Amino acid sequence: DSTRTFAKALAGTTILINNAIHPGEPDGINACLIWLDQWIAQGKPLESKNGDKLPVIAFIPAYNVGGMMNRSSTSRANQNGPEEYGFRGSTRNFDLNRDFIKMDSKNAFTFAKIFHSLDPDVFIDNHVSNGADYQYTLTYIASMKERMSPQMNELTYEKCIPYLTANVKQHGWDLFPYVELKGETPAQGIHAFNDLPRYAMGYASLFHSISFTVETHMLKPFPQRVQATLAFMEGIISFTTVNALEIEAKRSAAKLWARNLHQYAFNYQLTEKADSISFKGYEHSFPLHPITGLKELTYDRTKPYERMIPWFKTYIPKDSVSVPEYYVVGGQEQEVIDRLTANHVLFETLTSASIDTLHVFSVKSYKSPAQPYEGHFKLSQIEVGESERAIDLKPGDILVPSQQDAALFIHASLQPRAEDSYLTWNFFDSYLQQKEYFSNYVFKDQIADILAKNPQLQEEYQLRKATDEKFRNSEWDQLYFIYSRSPYFEQTFMRLPIYQKF
């Protein structure tokens, strides 16, 4: 049963292979079935031909069950087969491969239960690409090296990828990095993918799994894509089998690295530093389309080429913060606590009231989009002020220590300005709205007393009035300036229910 399998997985090296998170991209389902058929036909061996113990291999046949049931042959306009497939969106029309940190779906909670029960050393997410036309059937996305621990960076990029490239070549396939175009065509170069925690592989990387997204080419025939996916699977199984002890050791070292992190970097930006890579593509041109009358991009498969193109693969963090001893999350934030719990985050729940001096986050500004993204109006360009204050802690509030295996997940979700933090995903929007105001005709009679009791405010007010004509001519602006700095102003406005202790 599954419990025994999970126990066995925790005791050894484990691979988790995910399929059909986008059910219109079903190559991995068939590849896994073929692998299992072959394994059964061979007598269900538990060792490789060289006598090495096989890892525990767990398959998710179809992550997006709702999308799988929405069948058609038309939702993938640019894809070459199969005859029928599912739909990208879930029953609630979520792209579930954007849901791994915000966890809007039950799928994400179920996945977290599976993932943390297995604690996979290797995670594979099978997909089919969109984009340019080129000769490769099989491409891959590896986790962004700059966000990884030094141990997993070295293991992935210096050992695993070269091994996979050579292994699938023996099976007749070229393995190439995912063709994420820098411009309109490959001639302008390709760039490394930023696997944020919203994505399956980015999420898995937070827990130090070797993480890959397999991307077969949409225009290649379906049977060919399935065989290429199978070749990658066999390659990663072979690598994991041969290098099991090193993988286990490097992951343990990576967890220790994360527990002892002093500085957390985030908001990674792609640089203009370019390497070069040999690329097998097709010549392209821009003839006029007979219907639209406009220039169209066309690839000519009768004119294949192999040439060097730019490869942009270096990211640098725009921001970094010191790692606190622990975070405090208000006990009223049950949605946050549920997600921390689901991801095996360790925390202490307070049973009595107390007062502590904590590092407080106050939102100064942010941008909200005009259109929703995956069920949210995701915040960006967040500016946060920080200060030390005495905070009344209540029973039910939780203390989340940074020194634990889930450290990267904790920082990614609780640091307000991190790319996929819970603040950006609107978990704390209620704190961004003011709840109380004042009436001018009443409050104007109180300002003399407020200013008399606060000489610094009096000085700031007079300076603003002397230097800002708009302010000087607006009763509301003047009264609000004083009100927002007075004891009457609500303390919860723009102040997050997350604190830090250093």
PLM regions with names:
Residues 1-502:
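Structured catalytic-domain cores with a bias toward divalent-metal coordination
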